[in-house]
Swiss-Prot record:
A motif (pLxIS motif) lies at residues 480-483. One of its GO terms (cellular component) is host cytoskeleton. Interacts (via C-terminus) with host IRF3; this interaction leads to IRF3 degradation. Interacts with host IRF7; this interaction leads to IRF7 degradation. Interacts with host CUL1 and CUL3. Interacts with host BTRC. Its main location: host cell. This is Non-structural protein 1.
Length: 486
C-alpha cells in the first residue's frame, strides 16, 4: 500500500481542513477513466501503478482512480497536489513552509498516536503495533520530489514516493532538495516525530526516512512525444486538430512557491476554495516535440530513388513505380504541409542530382540514397547537416578557391522557385554547400519554423500564460493553409 495514500485516508478524519485537503480520488469510489498505459508514480496519491493521461496537460501522471478529480500540478486551485508543486528557484524558506504544511496536515503527537491506536484495535490480531496497521504513521517528512522541465521552467512535485527503484515510464525524475534546506534540521524534525511512535515502529520510520532523504538525484529526463496522450498523437496529422484541456482555477494570488502556506490560515483557505471553477481551453499542438514526431514518421516512408528518376509528377503522386511510389495510406500524409515539404525537397534534390551526376533511372542503386533518408528531420540538427554534406559530396562538386560548387540547371516546380528567390534572392545556376543547407531549411521552415518554435506544446503552460494567450487569440495557431513565412 502507498504510504502517502494511506496517510491521506486516515488523517483526513482528524479535522475539517484535512477532510478537504486530503481528499483523494484513490480513496473514494472508483469511476470509469481513460485506459491506463504507462508505469510510474501518480502525482496525486504518490502510489506506483498504471497511469492514465491528465486532462489538464495530457501527460501520463495520474492513476485511474485519481483521474476522476482531474487535478494537475499546473492548476491554479490550491488543492494538495498544487500546494506540493514548486517551480524553478526553490529557497530554504520555501522548503520550511512545505515542512510546516506537512506537520499541519500529518501531525504526530501523543494524542494522535492514541487516537489511531484506539481506532485500529478492533480485534486481538491488531493489538500489536505492526506496520500494516500503522502504515499512515510511518510517512516521514522528506524533501523527495519528482521533477520535470517544461520549456525552461522546472517543476518539483514533492511527496512521499515508495519503491523508487520501480519502473518509471514518465518524464518525471527523482530529485532530492535536502541540501538546499539542511540535513540536520530535517533530521531533527523527523526525530521529534519519531519519538512519539511506539518503539516497534520507530525502526521502520527511521529506515524509511533515511532511504528517502539521502538518495542521489537522478538526471533530468527529456520530454518526448510518447509522454503525451495517445489521443493527441493519433490526431497530430490533422492540421486543424486542437487539444481540449481543463484546468482547476481559483482566485489564487500568492506566489507559486508559497501556496503551501495557505493551510496556516484556514478561513482564508476556504474563502479561496469558494472561488474554485474549471476553465476549458482549446490549444494548438504546434511545438518542436510533435513536429519532430511528424518529420521522423515521414522520414521512415521516404523513397530516395525519386532523386534519380524521370517522373513528371510530384514525389507523393508517383503511381505504379516499384522504387518511387510511397504508401499514401499512412496518416502522416493527411497533413498537407508534410506533403508539400516532401515534394519540394525531392524536386530540389532531383534537380541537383540530374545537374551533376549521370544517372538515368530510378531503378539504379546509388550511394546517395542512404543519405537522402535523413533529409527531412531538421530537428536533429547535427545528423541532418551531416546528411546534407554527404549528399553534396555525392554530387562530385568542383573546388575553386577552397570553396566547392555544384551545378543547378534542371527543371524544378514553382514552389521551389519561390523558396529560392525568398532564401537566396534568385534562381542560381551554381550552388555551394551553404546554399544547399539554406534552401532545404527554408523549404521545411516555410511550414515548420523550429527556430522560434516552443519545445513542448501549450498544454504544459501555466494557467496565467494560457489566459494571456487566450485573450490575444493565440492559443490556436492558424494551420489551415497559412505558412510560417506568410
Amino acid at each position: 500500500m502507498a504510504t502517502f495514500k494511506d496517510a491521506c485516508y486516515h488523517y483526513k478524519r482528524i479535522n475539517k481542513l484535512n477532510q478537504t485537503v486530503l481528499k483523494l480520488g484513490v480513496n473514494d469510489t472508483w469511476r470509469p477513466s481513460p485506459p491506463t498505459k504507462y508505469k510510474g508514480w501518480c502525482l496525486d496519491c504518490c502510489q506506483h501503478t498504471d497511469l492514465t493521461y491528465c486532462r489538464g496537460c495530457t501527460i501520463y501522471h495520474v492513476c485511474q482512480w485519481c483521474s476522476q478529480y482531474g487535478r494537475c500540478f499546473l492548476d491554479d486551485e490550491p488543492h494538495l497536489l498544487r500546494m506540493r508543486t514548486f517551480k524553478n528557484e526553490v529557497t530554504k524558506d520555501n522548503l520550511k513552509n512545505l515542512i510546516d504544511m506537512y506537520n499541519t496536515l500529518f501531525p504526530i503527537t501523543q494524542k494522535i498516536i492514541h487516537r489511531f491506536i484506539n481506532n485500529t484495535r478492533q480485534h486481538k490480531c491488531r493489538n500489536e503495533c505492526m506496520t500494516q496497521w500503522y502504515n499512515h504513521l510511518l510517512m516521514p517528512i522528506t524533501l523527495q520530489s519528482l521533477s520535470i522541465e517544461l520549456d525552461g521552467d522546472v517543476y518539483y512535485i514533492f511527496g512521499y514516493y515508495d519503491s523508487m527503484n520501480n519502473i518509471n515510464q514518465t518524464p518525471f525524475s527523482f530529485t532530492n532538495l535536502v541540501d538546499i534546506y539542511d540535513k540536520l534540521l530535517l533530521d531533527d524534525v523527523n526525530f521529534v516525530r519519531m519519538s512519539f511512535l511506539p518503539t516497534s515502529l520507530q525502526r521502520e520510520y527511521a529506515l524509511r526516512y533515511f532511504s528517502k532523504s539521502r538518495f542521489i538525484s537522478e538526471q533530468r529526463k527529456c520530454v518526448n512525444d510518447s509522454h503525451f496522450s495517445i489521443n493527441v498523437l493519433e490526431n497530430l496529422y490533422n492540421p486543424n486538430f486542437k487539444v481540449q484541456i481543463t484546468r482547476n482555477c481559483s482566485e489564487l494570488s500568492v506566489d507559486w512557491n508559497e501556496a503551501c502556506k495557505l493551510v496556516k490560515n484556514v478561513s482564508a483557505y476556504f474563502d479561496i476554495l469558494k472561488t474554485s471553477h474549471v476553465e476549458f481551453y482549446s490549444v494548438s499542438t504546434r511545438c518542436r516535440i510533435f513536429t519532430r514526431c511528424k518529420l521522423e514518421m515521414a522520414s521512415k516512408l521516404i523513397k530516395p530513388n525519386y532523386v534519380t528518376s524521370n517522373h513528371k509528377t510530384l514525389a507523393t503522386e508517383v503511381r505504379n513505380c516499384k522504387w518511387c511510389s510511397i504508401n499514401n495510406s499512412y496518416t502522416v500524409w493527411n497533413d498537407f504541409r508534410i506533403k508539400k515539404i516532401y515534394n519540394n525537397i525531392f524536386s530540389f534534390l532531383r534537380a541537383l542530382v540530374k545537374s551533376n551526376v549521370n544517372i538515368g533511372h530510378c531503378s539504379s542503386q546509388e550511394k546517395i540514397y542512404e543519405y537522402v533518408e535523413n533529409v527531412l528531420n531538421v530537428c536533429d540538427d547535427k545528423r541532418w547537416k551531416t546528411s546534407i554534406m554527404e549528399i553534396f559530396n555525392c554530387l562530385e562538386p568542383v573546388e575553386l578557391n577552397d570553396v566547392k560548387y555544384v551545378l543547378f540547371n534542371y527543371e524544378i516546380n514553382w514552389d521551389v522557385i519561390n523558396v529560392l528567390i525568398h532564401s537566396i534572392g534568385k534562381v542560381p545556376q551554381i550552388l555551394t554547400l551553404e546554399n544547399v543547407i539554406t534552401i532545404i531549411q527554408s523549404i521545411v521552415y516555410e511550414w515548420f519554423d523550429i527556430t522560434y518554435m516552443r519545445n513542448t506544446p501549450m498544454v504544459t503552460f501555466t494557467i496565467d500564460k494560457l489566459r494571456r494567450l487566450h485573450i490575444g487569440l493565440k492559443t490556436v495557431d492558424s494551420d489551415s493553409g497559412i505558412s510560417d513565412v506568410e
